[in-house]
């Protein structure tokens, strides 16, 4: 029974076989893609800067505020990049977004950013801890992205090509590892 449910879920989620002839191919609006990258850079810069200030702050209460503000800035940058990127995808159909799922995707991004800032504050972490944190962060980023995709209401079905789906997970985990290492190094070498 559970095997059958899992098989049905996989068949409904992943595209099996060749891409159908009636697949909708769309284009991106370049100016919105650029805007999404700019907002992501501003969010990352703000989150990293707040993490650096937090690492030098002696007051625990102020550290908590800086941690929360940094997570919101970083998370908002991540989420905005993805959401604006989705808006830039021009389709010849009406697309709406389910507010609760859209908000949930933002919460996932902010929590992932909170974890990154928490891990980056640790003075020492080995390979296993970095891998675990990167894995958690990558899964959270994918969760944010695919929750945002699930929030789309349109007159079409969405399927994912398995190789690209799993590549997105590997990329998200790698980006998470890079973010943790970069933030940690910047805290050690800037003032």
Annotate each PLM feature.
Residues 2-191:
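Polytopic alpha-helical membrane-helix bundles and their juxtamembrane interface segments
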């Amino acid at each position: 029974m559970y095997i059958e449910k899992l098989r049905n879920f996989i068949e409904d989620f992943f595209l099996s076989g060749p891409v159908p002839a009636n697949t909708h191919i769309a284009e991106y609006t370049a100016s919105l893609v650029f805007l999404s990258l700019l907002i992501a850079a501003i969010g990352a810069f703000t989150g990293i800067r707040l993490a650096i200030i937090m690492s030098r702050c002696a007051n625990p209460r102020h550290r908590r505020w800086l941690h929360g503000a940094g997570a919101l800035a970083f998370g908002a940058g991540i989420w905005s990049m993805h959401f604006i990127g989705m808006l830039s995808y021009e389709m010849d159909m009406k697309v709406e977004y389910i507010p609760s799922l859209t908000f949930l995707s933002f919460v996932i991004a902010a929590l992932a950013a909170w974890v990154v800032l928490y891990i980056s504050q640790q003075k020492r972490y080995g390979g296993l801890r970095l891998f675990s944190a990167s894995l958690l962060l990558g899964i959270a980023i994918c969760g944010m992205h695919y929750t945002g995709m699930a929030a789309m209401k349109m007159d079409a079905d969405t399927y994912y090509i398995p190789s690209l789906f799993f590549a997105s997970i590997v990329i998200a985990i790698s980006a998470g590892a890079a973010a943790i290492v970069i933030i940690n190094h910047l805290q050690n070498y800037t003032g």
